[in-house]
C-alpha cells in the first residue's frame, strides 16, 4: 500500500508532459535511475521550508488550542501563510531565481515524500522511546507488526520540541500548495515579459483561496477526522506531504500547454 500510493502520485506526473497527457501504463514512463528521483538541492529546499514552518509556529499570534494530548499549540498558520505570501514581492525585487520550483517540480515532490518517510519514522521512534498518554495511542497502529504500525502510526498526535507534528504536516500541505502556485504564476509572468495568462492565474487563485480559508479556520483542524482518528504514520504523512503536488499539477499543466 505504501508503494502503491507513491507510485500513483509519481505516475500522474510522468504521464502528463508538455507534449502529451494520454492514459497509459505508467511503468514505461517511470524513470529507472536514482538520479531521476533524488536531487540534493530539492531535498534541502523542502527541508528549509519545513524549518521555516517550524520556526513560524512559535510566533505569538493566533489563538491557542489544547490538543488531545493536553498540549497547547498556537494556531498561527494563517499568519504564517500571509507572511510568506507577502515575502514574494521582495523575492521578485531581489531577482531571486524562482524557476527552481518549475524546473525541479518533480524533484521537490520526491523530496517531500522522502521527508514524509523521515517524519513518520520520527513519530514511530517518539512513540517507542517517549510514549505519550494512553488516550494518544492509536489501536490500529499497535499491532506488533512494524510495517503496519509504521504505516498506520502508533500515536495520534506526537509532539517534538513543543510542536505538534501532525499540525506541522497539515500546514506543510496547504501552505506548500499556496506557495507553489504563487511561485509558478510569478515565474510564468516574468518569463512571458509581463504578459498574464488569465486561465493560469485563475486556476492558481482558487487554490490559494482554498489554502487561505483552511488556514483561517485552522483552529478547527483538531475536530477533523484526520486529527482525531488517524494515526501519525506514513499513511498520513505521505498524504499531507504529497498534497501540494496534486492541485498544483493543474497549474503546471496549464503553464506547460499554454
Residue ranges of predicted features:
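Membrane-anchoring alpha-helices and their flanking helix-loop junctions
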Residues: 1-257
Amino acid at each position: 500500500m505504501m508503494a502503491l500510493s507513491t507510485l500513483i502520485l509519481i505516475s500522474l506526473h510522468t504521464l502528463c508532459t508538455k507534449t502529451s497527457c494520454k492514459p497509459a501504463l505508467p511503468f514505461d514512463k517511470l524513470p529507472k535511475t536514482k538520479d531521476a528521483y533524488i536531487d540534493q538541492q530539492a531535498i534541502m529546499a523542502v527541508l528549509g521550508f519545513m524549518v521555516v514552518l517550524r520556526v513560524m509556529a512559535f510566533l505569538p499570534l493566533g489563538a491557542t488550542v489544547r490538543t488531545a494530548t493536553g498540549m497547547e499549540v498556537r494556531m498561527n498558520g494563517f499568519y504564517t501563510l500571509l507572511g510568506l505570501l507577502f515575502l514574494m514581492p521582495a523575492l521578485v525585487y531581489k531577482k531571486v531565481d524562482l524557476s527552481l520550483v518549475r524546473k525541479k517540480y518533480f524533484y521537490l515532490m520526491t523530496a517531500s515524500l522522502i521527508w514524509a518517510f523521515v517524519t513518520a519514522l520520527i513519530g514511530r521512534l517518539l512513540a517507542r522511546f517517549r510514549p505519550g498518554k494512553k488516550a494518544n495511542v492509536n489501536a490500529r497502529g499497535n499491532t506488533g507488526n512494524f510495517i503496519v504500525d509504521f504505516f498506520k502510526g502508533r500515536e495520534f498526535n506526537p509532539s517534538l520540541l513543543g510542536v505538534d507534528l501532525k499540525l506541522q504536516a497539515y500546514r506543510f500541505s496547504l501552505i506548500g500548495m499556496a506557495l507553489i502556485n504563487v511561485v509558478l504564476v510569478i515565474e510564468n509572468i516574468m518569463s512571458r515579459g509581463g504578459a498574464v495568462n488569465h486561465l493560469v492565474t485563475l486556476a492558481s487563485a482558487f487554490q490559494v483561496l482554498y489554502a487561505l480559508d483552511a488556514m483561517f479556520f485552522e483552529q478547527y483542524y483538531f475536530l477533523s477526522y484526520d486529527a482525531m482518528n488517524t494515526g501519525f504514520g506514513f499513511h498520513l504523512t505521505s498524504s499531507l506531504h504529497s498534497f501540494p503536488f496534486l492541485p498544483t499539477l493543474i497549474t503546471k499543466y496549464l503553464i506547460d500547454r499554454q
